[in-house]
Amino acid sequence: MLVSGVPCPELNAVWNRNCTNYTGKVRALGAGAEAGAMASIVCDTSLVWHRVTADSLAQSLEARFQYFTERVMPHFKKDSMYHTCVFVPSYFDFVKVRNWFKSSDLDYSEVSEYSKDKKIAQARDMFYHNEKHFLLYTERCHFYRRFRLKGIRHLIFYQPPTFGWMFSELSNLLQKSFQNPRGGSETNMSITVIYTKYDIQRIKLCVGAETASKMLSSENSRHIFQPGAAE
């Protein structure tokens, strides 16, 4: 018997290779597993999904990083794109992204599972009060701390989160009640997601199984959604 809060490639591999039974096997999904967390997003901000092409899982790591630094970040470096939060699920990716931010001399603060409480409070305060352009945030930190970060006007998912509820929870932080009134215009807000075909299980949790399949089989590499429906 395998029990997990979320589907993942590692468990799928064990299931397919090692879980054999002459009477067969059964897989049960939790209630709402087909709907996707996007149905729980209540803010009016459009969600833009960018598909990155890669021929292997190993290649996808560098392809994602290259797409992020060369295709996504040039737009968010503009002065009009202050209050940008970059959410990074993997700590190894987080370190790589943080090192790139340092070498590029970008104005940022960071919150991770290894950050001290004093540093976290300082980083959040500077981000909210326009003193830092970017905030780097890790998935593991959010899993344990569940910070309701204020001041986010632009949210970048470096990779879809492991847990679907994180996708809707973080996206809903763009609501007006979490904003600094002096931080910018309500018309200048965005949610960006970078994904590859190897993120299929994570994508399903975010947008639902049917929509995820359509996204991966589509000729278009860019998809725009409003909360609850695709454009």
List PLM regions with ranges.
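Conserved helicase ATPase core of P-loop NTP-dependent helicases/translocases
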Residues: H83, D93-N99, D105-Y144
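Conserved interdomain hinge at the start of the Helicase C-terminal
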Residues: V14-W15, L29-L106, I203-V207
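Switch/connector loops and helix/strand junctions flanking conserved nucleotide-binding motifs
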Residues: E10-L11, V95, Y144-R148, F163-F167, ...
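Conserved RecA-like helicase motor core of SF1/SF2 enzymes
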Residues: K132-H133, Y137-G183
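Conserved segment of the helicase C-terminal RecA-like domain
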Residues: L2-S4, N172-G228
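Post-DEXD/H (motif II) to motif III coupling segment of the RecA-like Helicase ATP-binding lobe
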Residues: M1-A31
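Short glycine-/polar-rich loops that comprise or flank the Walker A/P-loop
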Residues: M81, L106, K150-R153, E186-I191
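Structural motif
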Residues: S4-V6, S56-Q59, F87-Y91, S112-S115, ...
